[in-house]
Design a protein with these regions (language model features):
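N-terminal, polar/charged subdomain of small-to-medium soluble alpha/beta proteins
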Residues: 1-80
């Protein structure tokens, strides 16, 4: 299972209406050489609505802690 697939599976607990996971690693090859190391997430889920930006980022980052411990270098999150 690829990192993208693992992230999709982990985010599924939020029951998103919409989720898009974009690998932006190609933009960062000059300073970081990793496969699926820079990820952008665009997501809409009822559980995230009405919460602060920090609360949403904490929720998502906590779901992905294993990915950060295994090579995920940067995560951009956009809650829609």
């Amino acid at each position: 299972m690829s990192r993208i697939e693992r992230i999709q599976a982990k985010l599924s607990v939020l029951k998103p209406y919409f989720q898009e996971i974009i690998d932006e690693s190609y933009k960062h090859t000059s300073h970081y050489d990793g496969i699926h190391s820079h990820i952008k997430i665009r997501i809409s889920a009822k559980i995230l609505q009405g919460k602060s930006l920090i609360a949403n980022h904490r929720t998502i980052n906590n779901l992905l802690i294993d990915e950060f411990n295994n090579g995920l270098h940067a995560l951009s999150i956009e809650v829609l």
